[in-house]
């Protein structure tokens, strides 16, 4: 693709982009107008408060309830992991809703603006879900609560990557949503998909690289069974994706990296739910037998 085909500044394209910019400018100008400014600022501060302090308060409350009502063991650790992940998703979702309310309370956004806001809010929830999953599985602050058999050194080394992946997806996903709203050219859509594929592949690549370096540095044993195959499969998948990018097959690379991302999210979610459910059944069976 040439620069002109990737960024086709035709009259129609410029008109759509300008209209969206006008819509965004209208919403923000209304939100910070003298009569609405304090409400917007209060919603912005409330969103930050919920995101930072609210998550800790909710997480602490859920942890206290879990410790109080569930017996020690894998069931408690499963519930604690779910509580940590749930607290992250709920608080970030509420913060995004408050920010949207502060922006749109005193204005009537256009259809394109409403579509963009809806898509961005969904994207925020998905990115928050990724961050919550990472925190729930790694449990850096509470190693004794960790469900997977992950050494502390590896958990600490991999800790920043769920947040990094969530932030990267938020930035690139925003561009994808804008392209969708303004109905941009196919060439630009494919180019953004290629950038998404490159970003996701690099995050997974550096996470895998840090995993191997940490394992060698601390002479840690490799995982056994099916879990031991995960680094190899992920590495091969990333390699194929990067080769597709280098070969110019952007759509194929995008397909592979999106599948890798979704399989990782689904597998991690299923692991948490199955661990919690199976342990709940085991504890229930033991209680029935004791009676």
PLM region spans:
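Short, small-residue-biased leader/transition segments that mark boundaries at the very start
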Residues: 1-12, 284-287
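Generic intrinsically disordered, low-complexity segments enriched for polar/acidic and small residues
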Residues: 1-4, 18, 208, 215
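Low-complexity, acidic polar-rich segments
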Residues: 6-30, 231-234
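Hydrophobic/aromatic interaction determinants used to assemble and anchor large protein complexes
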Residues: 26, 30-285, 291
């Amino acid at each position: 693709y040439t620069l002109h085909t990737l960024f086709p500044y035709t009259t129609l394209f410029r008109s759509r982009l300008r209209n969206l910019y006008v819509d965004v400018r209208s919403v923000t100008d209304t939100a910070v107008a003298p009569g609405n400014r304090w409400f917007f600022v209060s919603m912005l501060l409330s969103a930050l408060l919920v995101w930072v302090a609210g998550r800790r308060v909710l997480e602490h409350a859920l942890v206290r309830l879990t410790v109080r009502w569930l017996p020690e063991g894998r069931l408690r650790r499963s519930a604690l992991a779910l509580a940590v992940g749930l607290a992250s998703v709920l608080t970030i979702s509420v913060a995004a809703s408050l920010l949207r309310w502060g922006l749109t309370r005193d204005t009537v956004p256009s259809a394109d603006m409403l579509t963009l806001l809806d898509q961005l809010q969904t994207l925020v929830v998905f990115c928050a879900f990724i961050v919550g999953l990472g925190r729930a599985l790694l449990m850096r602050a509470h190693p004794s609560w960790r469900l997977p058999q992950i050494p502390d050194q590896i958990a600490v080394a991999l800790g920043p990557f769920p947040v990094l992946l969530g932030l990267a997806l938020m930035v690139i996903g925003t561009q994808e949503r804008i392209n969708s709203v303004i109905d941009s050219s196919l060439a630009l859509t494919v180019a953004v998909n290629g950038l998404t594929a490159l970003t996701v592949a690099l995050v997974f690549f550096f996470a895998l690289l840090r995993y191997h370096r940490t394992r060698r540095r601390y002479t840690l044993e490799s995982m056994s069974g099916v879990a031991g195959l995960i680094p190899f499969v992920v590495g091969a998948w990333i390699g194929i994706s990067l080769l597709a990018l280098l070969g110019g097959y952007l759509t194929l690379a995008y397909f592979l990296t999106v599948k890798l991302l979704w399989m990782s999210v689904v597998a991690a979610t299923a692991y948490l739910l199955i661990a919690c459910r199976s342990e709940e059944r085991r504890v229930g069976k033991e209680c029935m037998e004791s009676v």
